């Protein structure tokens, strides 16, 4: 009887082999589920980014309804004025911030710091990765990063073109980056059709532009200077002249400074755009370069049908 009771009270534990098997099974399940979870999270982030672009596109439409033209991107100085994203602040329910901004001063001016330092969620893609904090050692200090850039067309814009005797770029994007106020564009200027023309796309804080040569950041990389307040090309104005969605691979020796003026994203496989009609599309990084140029130009006469993504 005693032995029977002892038998009933006996407790069995996992053997080491059984425990290892259970751990292995759990590891396999985690390995199978983790990519699906990550994919679902990225899909949610991408959808949020799409909503940002839709909101920006609608704000530009409202700006056009008010002023009968698209926002003008100031090219007289890399320091002066403000970006198109500053101009549309009232249409992004940010009228108070807009009223605080002084367009007669630089976007780097301490007076405008109270506005340009704001990290506005609709100007920042949830998938974006900030490689390091915005530096506090030069005139970049205090300006919040952004994730979006207007389409200035198929050619880069050098604000010093006349000084160097270079031909003026074609300025064929939906938004004109120009030092001439009469070059502002309207929907009537988009003769290829607003549904066939890029309006705003993504940019990313992911390319080392150059090394700081002075100050507290000496020797550190400055990444892409994508500040939503800055009207300079590469910050809030991009072109299709350079590689589309370029990636800087450490150690491969391949880098083009022009890449900082290319549309790019931290999404996998492509870049999102809001077109002139307000529709948002994900454009594959494998798109034909000629096709991308046709989408960037507002008036080249090349109207695309089913161009594909």
Model segments located where?
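Intrinsically disordered, low-complexity segments enriched in polar/charged residues with Gly/Pro
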Residues: 6-7, 19, 257-262
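N-terminal single-pass transmembrane signal-anchor helix
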Residues: 11-45, 55
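N-terminal leader/signal peptides at the extreme start of proteins
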Residues: 1-16, 65
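Coiled-coil-like amphipathic alpha-helices with heptad-repeat character
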Residues: 4-6, 36, 41, 213, ...
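Surface-exposed loop/linker segments characteristic of extracytoplasmic
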Residues: 28, 43-309
